[in-house]
């Protein structure tokens, strides 16, 4: 491709509404332009990257044995009503009616559509297992689209759905897809981690997310320093460490006027937050009569509650909700000053996090306004109903697999795989005949990759102060050739044309910068766009039989003979 025939839409200034680096650089490099909130047009430069990601994903999905289909983004609302998600999904689901007053939705995902296809096309266990995939547009009506294509309303996704006769068959395909995703992200040149994850609104029994490590990531992931263990912080188990020591202090109450937070209390008492507990009073599961009990959750003062873990406790209502003022008053409790003493005796379930359960001589609320208790000890001063993992892990915690300690880094979720079980097949009546001639409900898995998000995530992981640094596999062009003074030097242009043709014949994506621009402008544009290899051809180099070569990550350029250059470029 020649720059004289290509849309160069680079910007010198960063648009004010671009928050994260990928959004800034995609705009400046001429990859995308905003059409409306959360909607973007992909320009030729961006489309080239998008198509390369698309090709790698498609190649690996085909290699896995999955079959490509293409489903409508517009879906009948009746399918979503059948699955029970029409109301459950919330305002992110864009609903509308056609001219005949038939209700439809714009698909944020395709579980309903693919299950409808399967129930009509799959008749026998002999047709199983099957795995269908598509690369298709999705629409989610985000309340606040932000970060460019990282969280847009319209986006491209690769979604796959598998159907099975048994859980064992699902597990086999799940493992294949896990390996397939690992190959995809490796080929894309990304530093990523597969992590155990919560199934969220999709549902199901098992789930892994694939995260690209980047400082701008919205998710915290924990992984071992000495093993392959990795999990979303929401899912990472906080291992019990140590044993409770015998009491050495007497229990007593102290005045703590207007000191409501743990930080304030510990500073006021000159105490270590690690030697304190904090209470979170939440609503429990209602009984047969509709009465909602209060459940007291206690954590160490320096730890944070993991709401997903708390919601998994059978006595805690989901979604998590704090106890009302009326409920607190009924037990004589004051928010900000609640301690564990006497709660079990009042009929309140006391669930204590593992780390808090091994404390002795700790600080806690006194169950009186403007007072706290010091020298508190479990069993002697306060009873525990149950010890349960309630907290987020922190850096340095032991890895749950017993190997090393945990590191925590930010990640951008670019892929997610689920074992759905029969959630959708049961709801939509997707059954096939078994070996015994009787119908049974099929078991499902689903597997997604955010194709447009991958592009942004790659930039978040690969950039410097000059612009993007693309992994070669997805760079819009692999090589840029810059002939110096081409409009005045036929010899330079001729050499550039010859090298351009030779490299193209070898299968490289090559950009010949034949613009009548100053060299500095050309170099700046090429660095901004992140092209991995730059070759400059000038009169002096031709006299010496060399080409000036600079890799995008190189600090300095070097002069290479043609043989050295071709060896450097060899894949």
Swiss-Prot record:
GO BP of this protein: prolyl-tRNA aminoacylation
EC number: 6.1.1.15
Subcellular location field: Cytoplasm
Pfam families in the cross-refs: HGTP_anticodon, tRNA-synt_2b, tRNA_edit
Disulfide bonds: none
GO CC list: cytosol
Main subcellular location of this protein, as a coarse class: cytoplasm
Enzyme class: ligase
InterPro entries: aa-tRNA-synt_IIb, aa-tRNA-synth_II, aa-tRNA-synth_II/BPL/LPL, Anticodon-bd, Anticodon-bd_dom_sf, Pro-tRNA-ligase_IIa, Pro-tRNA-synth_IIa_bac-type, Pro-tRNA-Synthase_IIa_type1
Example GO molecular function: aminoacyl-tRNA deacylase activity
Catalytic activity: tRNA(Pro) + L-proline + ATP = L-prolyl-tRNA(Pro) + AMP + diphosphate
Keywords linked to the UniProt accession: Aminoacyl-tRNA synthetase, ATP-binding, Cytoplasm, Ligase, Nucleotide-binding, Protein biosynthesis
Top-level taxon in the UniProt lineage: Bacteria
Coiled coil start-end: none
Subunit structure, as described in the record: Homodimer.
Family per similarity comment: Belongs to the class-II aminoacyl-tRNA synthetase family. ProS type 1 subfamily.
NCBIfam families: PRK09194.1, proS_fam_II
Function text: Catalyzes the attachment of proline to tRNA(Pro) in a two-step reaction: proline is first activated by ATP to form Pro-AMP and then transferred to the acceptor end of tRNA(Pro). As ProRS can inadvertently accommodate and process non-cognate amino acids such as alanine and cysteine, to avoid such errors it has two additional distinct editing activities against alanine. One activity is designated as 'pretransfer' editing and involves the tRNA(Pro)-independent hydrolysis of activated Ala-AMP.
Free-text comment on this protein's domains from its UniProt entry: Consists of three domains: the N-terminal catalytic domain, the editing domain and the C-terminal anticodon-binding domain.
Listed name of the protein: Proline--tRNA ligase
Source organism (scientific name): Acinetobacter baumannii (strain SDF)
């Amino acid at each position: 491709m020649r720059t004289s025939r290509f849309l160069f839409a680079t910007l010198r200034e960063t648009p004010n509404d671009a928050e994260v680096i990928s959004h800034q650089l995609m705009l400046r490099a001429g990859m995308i332009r905003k059409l409306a909130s959360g909607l973007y047009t992909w320009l030729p430069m961006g489309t080239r990257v998008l198509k390369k990601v698309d090709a790698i994903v498609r190649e690996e999905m085909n290699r896995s044995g999955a079959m490509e289909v293409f489903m409508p983004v517009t879906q009948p609302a009746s399918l979503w009503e059948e699955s029970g998600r029409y109301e459950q999904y919330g305002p992110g689901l864009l609903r509308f009616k056609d001219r005949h007053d038939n209700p439809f939705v714009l698909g944020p995902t395709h579980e309903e559509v693919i299950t409808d296809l399967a129930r009509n096309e799959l008749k026998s266990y002999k047709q199983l297992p099957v795995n269908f995939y598509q690369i298709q547009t999705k629409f989610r009506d985000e309340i606040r689209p932000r970060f460019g294509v990282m969280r847009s309303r319209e986006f491209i996704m690769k979604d796959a759905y598998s159907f099975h006769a048994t859980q064992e068959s699902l597990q086999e395909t799940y493992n294949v897809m896990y390996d397939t995703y690992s190959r995809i992200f490796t080929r894309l040149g990304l530093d990523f981690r597969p992590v155990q994850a919560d199934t969220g609104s999709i549902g199901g029994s098992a789930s892994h997310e694939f995260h690209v490590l980047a400082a701008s990531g919205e998710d915290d992931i924990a992984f071992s320093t000495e093993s392959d263990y990795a999990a979303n912080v929401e899912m990472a188990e906080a291992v019990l460490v140590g044993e409770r020591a015998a009491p050495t202090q007497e229990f007593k109450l102290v005045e703590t006027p207007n000191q409501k937070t743990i930080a304030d209390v510990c500073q006021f008492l000159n105490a270590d937050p690690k030697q304190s507990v904090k209470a979170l009073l939440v609503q429990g599961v209602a009984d047969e009569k509709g009465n909602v009990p209060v459940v007291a959750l206690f954590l160490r003062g320096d730890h944070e509650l993991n709401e997903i873990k708390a919601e998994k406790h059978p006595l805690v209502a989901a979604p998590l909700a704090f106890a009302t003022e009326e409920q607190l008053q009924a037990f004589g409790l004051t928010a900000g000053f609640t301690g564990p003493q006497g709660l079990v005796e009042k009929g309140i379930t006391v669930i204590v996090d593992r780390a808090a359960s091994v404390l002795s001589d700790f600080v806690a609320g006194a169950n009186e306004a403007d007072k706290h208790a010091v020298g508190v000890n479990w069993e002697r001063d306060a009873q525990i109903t149950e010890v349960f993992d309630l907290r987020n892990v922190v850096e340095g915690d032991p890895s749950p697999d017993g190997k090393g300690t945990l590191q925590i880094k930010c990640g951008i979720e670019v892929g997610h795989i689920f074992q759905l079980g029969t959630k959708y097949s049961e709801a939509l009546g997707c059954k096939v005949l078994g070996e015994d001639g009787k119908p049974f409900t099929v078991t499902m898995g689903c597997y997604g990759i955010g194709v447009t998000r991958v592009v942004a995530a790659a930039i978040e992981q690969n950039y410097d102060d000059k612009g993007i640094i693309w992994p070669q596999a997805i760079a819009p062009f692999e090589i840029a050739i810059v002939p110096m003074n081409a409009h005045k030097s036929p010899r330079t242009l001729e050499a550039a044309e010859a090298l351009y043709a030779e490299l193209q014949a070898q299968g490289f994506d090559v950009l010949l910068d034949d613009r009548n621009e100053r060299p500095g402008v050309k170099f700046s544009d090429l660095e901004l766009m992140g092209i991995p290899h730059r070759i400059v051809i000038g009169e002096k180099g031709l006299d010496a039989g060399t080409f000036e070569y600079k890799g995008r990550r190189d600090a300095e350029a070097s002069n290479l003979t043609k043989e050295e250059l071709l060896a450097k470029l060899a894949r």
